[in-house]
Amino acid sequence: MSTFTAKNETVQRDWYLVDAEGKTLGRLCTELARRLRGKHKPVYTPHVDTGDYLVVINAEKIVVTGKKLQDKMYHRFTGYIGNLKTESLAQALERHPERVIETAVKGMLPKGPLGRQMYRKLKVYAGTEHPHAAQQPQVLDI
């Protein structure tokens, strides 16, 4: 008996709809990253993208515990001297709420070409509207 290895052509990828309203940021994102990698499937293979497509709605209604809204900071550097841009989680949620979930999930995925391929299967939207009705996503309760 030989060890089973999933092939990229034979992997079945489903579409799921996740409502982020009232969910804790970290707990939701760890489960999203797990499902993007495909670790919830019995055919999981580390070097093959076996994960599903995830559509996350209501990203603007995500919840964090403690004082993270003021204390958690996001940094980005333009490359110019003295141009380190910093914003708090509250400011980031106000400006672009979908990017908060995307950043958290991206940090939990592998770095490299396979991780980028997994990340492309995540679709995050601030409100309840999304353009993926044709894919008929199943509602996933996390």
UniProtKB/Swiss-Prot annotation:
Presence of the UniProt keyword Cell inner membrane in the record: no
GO molecular function, one term: mRNA binding
PROSITE patterns noted in UniProt: RIBOSOMAL_L13
Keyword Plastid included in the entry's annotation: no
GO cellular component terms, semicolon-separated: cytosolic large ribosomal subunit
Sorted UniProt keywords: Ribonucleoprotein, Ribosomal protein
Matches recorded under InterPro entries: Ribosomal_uL13 (IPR005822), Ribosomal_uL13_bac-type (IPR005823), Ribosomal_uL13_CS (IPR023563), Ribosomal_uL13_sf (IPR036899)
GO biological process annotation, one example: negative regulation of translation
Membrane-spanning segments: none
Quaternary structure (record): Part of the 50S ribosomal subunit.
Function: This protein is one of the early assembly proteins of the 50S ribosomal subunit, although it is not seen to bind rRNA by itself. It is important during the early stages of 50S assembly.
Similarity comment text for this entry: Belongs to the universal ribosomal protein uL13 family.
Protein name: Large ribosomal subunit protein uL13
Name of the coding gene: rplM
